[in-house]
Amino acid sequence: LGGDIIGKLAVPIIREGSGGYRATLQGTTEHIDSEEGLKALLDRLGLLGFYHKIMTEEEFRTLAADQAAVDGLFHTLARQRLEAWIELANSRLGGTGIRCFVTGGNDDYPNVLEVMKTSGSQVFIDCEGAVANIDEDHTMISVGNSTLTPWKTPREVTDEELGRIIDGMIAQVSDLHRCIFNFHDPPNDSTLDTCPELDWTTDPPTPIVKAGQMVMHGAGSKSVRKAIETHQPMLGLHGHIHESSGAIKIGRTLCINPGSEYGEGILRGGVERVRASLKVTGLPAPPISTRWLPSGAPI
């Protein structure tokens, strides 16, 4: 699992004096008068990856006036959700031999990701910053940082710094042809990174329009592309650019970005199968097969 782990929103649910509840979701204020309605709302919020906190009107006003308290609550809710996911993985995957390798993205705060590092889980594996042994033949290196964006997210670095991070990981790998490059930022100008070009001087950033058409550009990392072109790993796993799903080849390397439709409650991903190969020194890495749904959505 790779990508931004943290939710995009925390929704306050106001407990009203009448015994009902009030919440504003996606610009619409909803009034809820039953526990069944509240459960339905919580299910919708969970499907969207949002957090929630039930509070009184007075508690809401006090919280809204204190940005530090808002940030603290958001981080607490994010950590609690991640802890719940780890416990779910432990209960479902424990004893099966299946491991779930997980990395964050540029939106994730380090203090939230710390939950993964300290969980001690044997099935929910924080694989960022270390060489992960997928099996006895194949390894994976993971980097969740991205290059700079107009939103100034917590784990952005310059493309040059991203290149140094990647080079440090590559130096730890003995056989790069049997390695997976799990880098959140996609390779530059690869069609896995195509998105609207934004005007960074506006708040919020707005798409640049010329002749009535949005200007599109490749927003991925030049350092990621250089690493793939130079070392030709067996597979590149990427994300970051939500609207640019696809699978392409850079040399021998299959690179994939499943895209994201979190706003619609859709989880996108891919199934990659590494064919078995004989252990003979000098043989190339085994081929990769990718399976896609007829709609184009990866499975």
How would you name each of these model-derived features?
Residues 64-83, 180-232:
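Active-site-proximal segments of metal-dependent phosphoesterases and phosphodiesterases across multiple
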Residues 99-102, 118, 122-123, 128, ...:
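Conserved beta-sheet core of the metallophosphoesterase superfamily
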Residues 3-7, 105-108, 130-131, 143-147, ...:
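Active-site metal-binding loops of divalent metal-dependent hydrolases
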Residues 131-142, 176-180, 248-255, 282-287:
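Beta-strand-turn-beta hairpins that frame and shape the catalytic cleft
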Residues 1-135:
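Core catalytic region of metal-dependent phosphoesterases/phosphodiesterases
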Residues 75-89, 158-168, 272:
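Well-ordered, non-membrane alpha-helical segments in soluble/globular domains
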Residues 136-180, 199-200, 214-222:
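Binuclear metal-dependent hydrolase catalytic cores centered on His/Asp/Glu-rich metal-binding motifs
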Residues 172-175, 281-299:
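A short C-terminal boundary segment appended to hydrolase-like catalytic domains
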